């Protein structure tokens, strides 16, 4: 696939997602990084977003709960280039009814080449990166060219 570029602004649009067994860990991570995260635009699946708002006072765009379609909403926002970073603390040891949605979400984050943290260590590396608070250009699929090729 042909690529183009997209510039991610210094003020990031960050999606927060977590499975039930990981919510406490994600909340602790958000609290630890509250001052920095409050400088960015936060989105989250329903339960996670409400827990983050209640615990931190940070405004969060709350979507549907993951099993009710929230993971797919986040995926759609990624495809629309409205999410710059995905922080997704998922539980690899417990299956969830919406596992196909989880796989689709991670696939879209990979297709659109956004940074993804699936555990606390990776989230720490990501938020401590010099790129986190600055403008950065990433390579993404050239969808217009892709569509042109498909319509030939």
Curated annotation (Swiss-Prot):
The active site is at 71 (proton donor/acceptor). One of its GO terms (molecular function) is methylglyoxal synthase activity. It is an enzyme of class 4 (lyase). Transmembrane segments: none annotated. One of its GO terms (biological process) is methylglyoxal biosynthetic process. It comes from the Bacteria. One of its GO terms (cellular component) is cytosol. This is Methylglyoxal synthase.
């Amino acid at each position: 696939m042909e690529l183009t570029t997209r510039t991610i602004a210094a003020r990031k649009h960050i999606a927060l997602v977590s499975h039930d067994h990981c919510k406490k860990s994600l909340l602790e991570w958000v609290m630890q990084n509250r001052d920095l995260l409050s400088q960015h635009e936060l989105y989250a699946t329903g339960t996670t977003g409400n827990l983050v708002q209640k615990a931190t006072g940070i405004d969060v765009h709350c979507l549907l709960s993951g099993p009710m379609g929230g993971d797919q909403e986040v995926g759609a926002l990624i495809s629309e280039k409205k999410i710059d970073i995905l922080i997704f603390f998922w539980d690899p040891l417990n299956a969830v009814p919406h596992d196909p949605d989880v796989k689709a979400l991670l696939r879209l984050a990979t297709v659109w080449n956004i940074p993804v943290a699936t555990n606390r260590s990776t989230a720490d590396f990501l938020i401590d990166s010099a790129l986190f608070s600055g403008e950065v250009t990433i390579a993404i699929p050239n969808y217009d060219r892709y569509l042109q090729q498909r319509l030939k």
